[in-house]
Curated annotation (Swiss-Prot):
It comes from the Eukaryota. Belongs to the TDRP family. GO terms for cellular component: cytoplasm; cytosol; nucleus. Its main location: nucleus. Residues 126-183 are annotated as: Disordered. It is found in: Nucleus; Cytoplasm. One of its GO terms (biological process) is spermatogenesis. This is Testis development-related protein.
Length: 209
């Protein structure tokens, strides 16, 4: 009896549980639809769509790049290795030709400043150290020898004292006799002065040497 009643009760209760489960599923579906209709969900769907489109475009680009790479291979197959080396040499030569200009500028600057420093440090050379320089040869001319006529000695002139005694303190130079004597006397004095001056010059030159 108990078993039969229990089975009846379970059979009677089962349709109600099924109805509740169906209702719960419907409620969940409605909630999901509302979430999909919300702006956040719309943004998410847009992002998913954009990702799909970008992925498809990337596939297209990969195919295009592959085609361009094949075209580049075809173009490079036209040229030989020698042509490639010549092209590379031309580019290298341009780079090398650009570098020496900068090097020349730096060298010029360094040379200019170095030359100034060298000029300041170099001491002026003496005349003896200069190559090819020789001291001037000074030849001492012999002084002319004059015969001693006794012009310097006033006592050798006859009648000189007699004429001066009768005159005043100073003799008269305007007279004809005295003028000739004075000219002879002065000539003798000049010769002696020249001899003395030449002797002084030779002594000075010897001291300098």
């Amino acid at each position: 009896m108990w078993k039969l009643n229990k089975s009846k009760v379970l059979i009677e209760d089962s349709p109600d549980e099924e109805i509740q489960a169906q209702q719960d599923a419907q409620i969940k579906d409605q909630l999901l639809q509302e979430e999909v209709q919300s702006p956040v969900s719309q943004l998410a769907t847009k992002e998913l769509q954009s990702l799909k489109t970008s992925f498809s475009s990337m596939k297209g680009q990969v195919t295009v790049q592959g085609a361009s790479f094949r075209g580049w291979k075809e173009v490079t197959s036209i040229f030989n290795k020698d042509d490639e080396q010549q092209l590379l040499k031309g580019a290298k030569s341009k780079v090398i030709s650009a570098k020496p200009k900068e090097d020349l500028k730096t060298e010029k600057k360094a040379g200019f400043w170095d030359s100034l420093a060298i000029k300041q440090n170099i001491q002026p050379k003496k005349a003896d150290e200069i190559e090819g320089w020789e001291p001037p040869h000074i030849t001492v001319e012999e002084s002319p020898t004059f015969p001693d006529d006794g012009l310097d000695d006033p006592n050798s002139w006859p009648g000189w004292e007699d004429e001066t005694k009768g005159s005043t303190k100073y003799t008269n130079l305007t007279s004809s006799g005295n003028s000739s004597r004075w000219s002879i006397k002065s000539a003798g004095k000049l010769v002696s002065i020249r001899r003395r001056s030449k002797g002084n010059l030779t002594e000075n030159w010897k001291e300098l040497e």
